[in-house]
Amino acid sequence: MMWWAIWCVMVVVSSAASAAPAPDSAPMDLVQIDSAGPDDESLGYAVSSLEGRYGAEAPWLYLLAEMPRDSQIGRAAVKRRMPSLSIDLPMSVLRQKLSLEKERKVHALRAAANRNFLNDIGKRGLQWSRSEQPSAYY
């Protein structure tokens, strides 16, 4: 497995070394690289070469060739805020209400057990003799 990692590192290093310019090369002319795109009138050559491939079924091809270059740049798609159809929030509310109901039942059972325990204090003989034991505790 180690040879695979070494091979990957070698490929990355060699690609980085081959992408770097030679030390004795002339500096790049950034003005030439950043030059503006072709004029709108010169886009006719692209339309004529693509007509054979797409034919008359592609009216968008002519529309793109006739649009000015500035109108195609800088438009971000507007994100519409649609109402959410997620059930996460209602489910979390239901979970919370269920846990509160469970806690309420546990507290009620503990209170009843404590009440029964406190009713039995000082009445040790009641639980052993059936004749003296009342039918229900309140």
Swiss-Prot record:
Q: Pfam families recorded for this chain?
A: CRF
Name the predominant localization. Answer: secreted
Q: Does the keyword Signal apply?
A: yes
Cite the SMART domains for this sequence: CRF (SM00039)
Annotated signal sequence is 1-19
Q: Provide one Gene Ontology cellular component.
A: extracellular region
Propeptide residue ranges?
20-78, 125-138
Question: What UniProt keywords are attached to this protein's entry?
Answer: Amidation, Cleavage on pair of basic residues, Hormone, Secreted, Signal
Per the record, residues carrying Isoleucine amide are 121
Q: Which GO terms describe its biological process?
A: body fluid secretion
Which GO-annotated molecular functions does the record name?
diuretic hormone activity
Q: Where in the cell is it found?
A: Secreted
**In the UniProt record, does the keyword Oxidoreductase occur?**
no
Function field: Regulation of fluid secretion.
Q: Which family does it belong to?
A: Belongs to the sauvagine/corticotropin-releasing factor/urotensin I family.
- What is the protein name given in its UniProt record? Diuretic hormone 1
- Organismal lineage: Eukaryota, Metazoa, Ecdysozoa, Arthropoda, Hexapoda
